[in-house]
Amino acid sequence: MRIGVYPGSFDPVTNGHMDIVERSVGLFDRLIVAVAKNAQKKPLFSVEERVEILKNVLKKYPNIVVDTFDGLTVTYALQQGAIAIVRGLRAFSDFENEFIFALTNKKLAPDLETVYLMTRAEYSFISSTTVKEVASFKGSLSGMVPEIVAQKIQDKYGYGK
């Protein structure tokens, strides 16, 4: 079985994340969308909330599993029997950081590949940080996140449609 791991904080999941999922799901028999537990970040949504949101927006994909992990992504991927880690790239600046991570992962796990997918142009400006900033000023999240995610963000920030 070909297993891929798409790790991230997904705080919140964006249309850019969804684009990468939708394009990578067919590359593997099973795709694990792995929510990182990062104690150093102050998340908008708890890990449990992010898992619930992801399960909701990804329910139409029978070969996707949503899970959580802490520690090194490469260790988690190996524990899951993955053949690859999936990463999305928005800009050259993303590649620079991802390149270092991929080289480190290759050193730690020589048989584990890193698969990069370029985010579609219409999503290249979207990041979870940008979404949270727009939401903090009660701006429209249309086109940035799935509708159910927009509603949950608006609930967190105390404003409606």
From Swiss-Prot:
Site, Transition state stabilizer: residue positions: H17
Annotated compartments: Cytoplasm
Keyword Magnesium: yes
Cofactor requirements of the protein: Mg(2+)
Enzyme Commission number: 2.7.7.3
UniProt entry keywords in alphabetical sequence: ATP-binding, Coenzyme A biosynthesis, Cytoplasm, Magnesium, Nucleotide-binding, Nucleotidyltransferase, Transferase
SUPFAM superfamilies per UniProt: Nucleotidylyl transferase
List of residues binding substrate: S9, K41, T73, R87
PANTHER family xrefs: PHOSPHOPANTETHEINE ADENYLYLTRANSFERASE
Identification of the protein by name: Phosphopantetheine adenylyltransferase
Organism: Desulforamulus reducens (strain ATCC BAA-1160 / DSM 100696 / MI-1) (Desulfotomaculum reducens)
